[in-house]
Amino acid sequence: WMVVDMIQQVSKPVETYVAGDDDQAIFRWAGADIEHFIAMAKDTNNTVIPLTQSYRVPKSVHTLATKMAQSISNRIDKQYDPRDDEGERKVLNFRPLNKSLAEGEWLILCRTHEIVKQVCESLDRYGWLYKCYGKSIVNEKIIEAIVSWTRLQKGEKVSGARIDTVYSFMDSTRIKRGHGTFKGSHTELYTIDNLIHSFGLRENIGGDLFTKTLHWYDVLNAKGIRKRIRYLRAVMRDGHKLDDKPRIEVSTIHASKGGERDNVMLLTDLSYGPY
């Protein structure tokens, strides 16, 4: 607020707009000054323009949120109407996530990073595609490598650019020394036989495993993909494509400010750290 006051003094603006909601001031720990904001709203020299209509919050959620807001001791009384939809509010058990989240789009909000981690581990076991803090858990390059190797295994030709990606997820037990980076043209097309004969792909792995017969999860073994193989296979077993749009997102309450989905799950669990 000192910076805002200084800018006003120096620039001499005709009007300054300050937007906020004292009921959602969850960043006090990061410097949010709720008392100063409320004082500005009560200053008769300032004009307050309340936004009285929500276009996102349904009635059932609005009732609960309003009841909780009444317990805030220092707040601005305000009119805030829900959208014209009853909505639905459920109390769900964290444990049977596989039943609760089987259908629809979900935003899972957690109080701590540790709880986010636990939820993600559960989603991994169930084989569901999801985003964590807004980013897909499946790297696009990993998807490209899996699809490209599967095509090679079927006898199809693949571009050198895609083969370069495949090679980036293999170690020296799959590729001969000196061929860690694909040396061919990125625009040319190659078969798996081309790679074995001219570009360092080993014909056999471990002495008796014929490379051409191996699935992607046996061939792609670099560190970046190895720890995700079990999860990726679980996703595919569940009938999903790796490049499907994730319908589940996991985040802390703080990090998801402004996020929305058809269904929102709020986990009130606390890990040991915050106590």
Briefly describe each language-model feature range:
Residues 1-85, 107-125, 133-141, 244-249, ...:
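Conserved helicase motor core of SF1/SF2 NTP-dependent helicases
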Residues 110-275:
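Core RecA-like ATPase module of SF1/SF2 helicases and allied nucleic-acid translocases
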